Amino acid sequence: MNVTVTVYDKNVKYRLEENIKNNKGPSNDDQPAYNNESKSTDGSDYAMFPTNIKYIFEDNNDELVDSSDAALTAGIDKVGDELENVIIVQLDESGSLEDITLISDQYELLSHRTNSLSLEENQMRTLSSHGDDKSNDEEEELSVDSDRFRVDSDIELDVISQFCDLSPFLRDLSLNDLIKLYVTQNEQLQMLSNSV
């Protein structure tokens, strides 16, 4: 099973920084600029790809889970490493997302999305990629093993980083743009308070 995790920081400061870097204010054509529903395609998100994965474990219900400090920090060098942000992804046996948790002092989880290929789509993709290797004259059948027919999941997290002073970015914004900005921040705060 392949799991890809992408984290999008929805903090409005990134959109404001982009506007200043491009030496332009938000235009009327740029409607989703401060919209909470905007995706990375409009450039309003700061995308991060977690790569410092220390350990992955499977919880087997038949075994006693070791919850000691040594087990929970396996693979972490006490002197050189310090965990800053932890994303816990719980998948069931079929690879479907059961739960996701973000433990962080710098970020709060707003929402998450999954985009999983079904088993049939994975099988078709695998068969078509291996189809060139087999000739039609051979009567061999492709065996179904767990390595070749796995479920691939893309998990996207929308997070919000700590609010910061935006006053240097706000000087050239119109009243309409300021209203959109504060509406977006209020929606984000409402999502956070609803999750508590």
UniProtKB/Swiss-Prot annotation:
- Keyword set for this entry? Autophagy, Chromosome partition, Cytoplasm, Cytoskeleton, Karyogamy, Microtubule, Phosphoprotein, Protein transport, Transport
Post-translational modification comment from the UniProt entry: Highly phosphorylated. Ser-174 is phosphorylated constitutively. Phosphorylation at Ser-174 is required for autophagy induced by various autophagy stimuli such as nitrogen starvation and rapamycin treatment.
Region feature Disordered, mapped onto this chain:
20-45, 120-145
Where Phosphothreonine occurs along the chain?
T41
Null allele phenotype: Decreases the percentage of cells having vacuolar ATG8, impairs ATG9 recycling between the PAS and the cytoplasmic pool, and reduces autophagy by about 60%.
Give the record's GO biological process terms.
Answer: autophagosome assembly; autophagy; autophagy of mitochondrion; chromosome segregation; karyogamy; nucleophagy; piecemeal microautophagy of the nucleus; protein transport
Alphabetical list of Pfam families matching this protein: ATG31 (PF09795)
- Where Phosphoserine occurs, the residues are S38, S40, S44, S116, S135, S143, S146, S153, S174, S195
Spell out the subcellular localization from the entry. Cytoplasm, Cytoskeleton; Preautophagosomal structure
Assigned GO CC terms: Atg1/ULK1 kinase complex; cytoplasm; cytosol; microtubule; phagophore assembly site; protein-containing complex
Comp. bias regions, Polar residues: 22-43, 120-129
Q: Describe its partners and assembly state.
A: Forms a stable complex with ATG17 and ATG29. Interacts directly with ATG29. The ATG17-ATG29-ATG31 complex interacts with the ATG1-ATG13 complex. Note=The interaction with the ATG1-ATG13 complex is induced by starvation.
Beyond the main fields, what else does the record say? Present with 486 molecules/cell in log phase SD medium.
What is the protein named? Autophagy-related protein 31
Biological classification of the source: Eukaryota, Fungi, Dikarya, Ascomycota, Saccharomycotina
